Amino acid sequence: MTFKVGLVGCGRISDIYIENCARFEGVEIVACASLDLDESRAKAAQHSIPRACLVDDIISDAAIDCVLNLTIPAAHADIALRAVQAGKHVYSEKPLVTDVEDGRRLLDAARQAGVLVGNAPDTFLGGRWQTVRRLIDEGVIGHPTGVGAYVGTHGTERHNPNPDFYYQPGGGPLLDLGPYYLTAMVFCLGPIARVASMASRAFDQRMIENGPRNGQWMQVEVDTHSLSLIEFESGVIGSMMISFDVWDSETPRLEIYGEEGTICIADPDPVHGANIFGGEVLYRTRDTSRWTHQPRPVGRDSWQVAQCHHGYNVNSRGLGLLDLALAVKEGRQPRASGELAYHVFEVMDAIAVSPAAARCQDVMISCARPDPLPVSFPDYLT
């Protein structure tokens, strides 16, 4: 039976979702809606979606199984709550909500309605992060002991013609990029117990440097540089730097340290790393390490490259929606679940609160560590 999806939000990101869903077996986008009906009609015509309509039409249509919620972050909670109250499953773009209480209300309503909530990011379901998880589960680096994530850009004003919301409440690098890294960490290392952080903003205003608004100034209302310490329930400790105030960097995007080795995600591009589904996974072990010897060993300049056995190594946005559709059929929770997204959001909320509180913040909402995808999971995008 086809899992029928109604799309709400027809912005730029919707294209890759629509294109991928058209290739997923058993999933069909049957209607699309936005605040602007003309925009909905244009999107439907562009992708041959059967119906363009209003948001209320999708919420009330009994033939639609799931709402794909690609609205702006401030609207995520409202659209998702309306969907579950109408008896529909929902899959939303990140973040799940912009307020902790909204997240609790949404998940409670979903449980009462007997429907599932899924949420981006789903990049951790891609081949790269499944490979990282395999290395950990197979004991290649031994018991994990630490993790470091480093992502710094200089914001979005050079390539996005309307970047204002990135610098308004609900935006900023923590909520924009943090979900990718924190979700990958939780997938690999389990839920987070507490955090401590410092934050700053380098500029009170930023200039838009592209498009029809080139040269216009916008106010910066959120912190744009965050440095966090993270303690996991397992005892692993880590750090995360995430910033819109960095012009360039050579730091790896993420490293996981274990008793017997290191896993490295070495991408120089700050919008790669945990933001993408594929890519190299490098590792070293006790036997191939460089810096534990004097004099330094010869012939160990290159890292070992892990073999990837999993699919989805291209831009696979919507993979979490496919897994949600299968979860409905199989009677289980989706891997990119609302509970996972809620935990990650509470972690980010604690990180945001910590600088003013000047102390560690406990994370009150835990979650299950998502299961890896089986190697046999069908790859519809290659």
Report residues per predicted region.
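Short acidic low-complexity segments
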Residues: 50-60
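Predominantly a Rossmann-like dinucleotide-binding segment in NAD(P)-dependent oxidoreductases
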Residues: 123-219, 358
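Beta-strand-loop-alpha-helix segment that lines the small-molecule cofactor/substrate pocket
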Residues: 66, 72-73, 77-124, 139
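N-terminal Rossmann-like dinucleotide-binding module
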Residues: 1-47
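Short glycine-/small-residue-rich Rossmann-like dinucleotide-binding loops
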Residues: 63, 71-72, 242
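Glycine-rich phosphate/pyrophosphate-binding beta-alpha loops
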Residues: 241-249
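Core-facing hydrophobic residues within beta-strands of well-ordered domains
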Residues: 27-29, 64, 144, 192
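C-terminal glycine/acidic-rich active-site capping loop/insertion
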Residues: 204, 208-214, 218-221, 227, ...
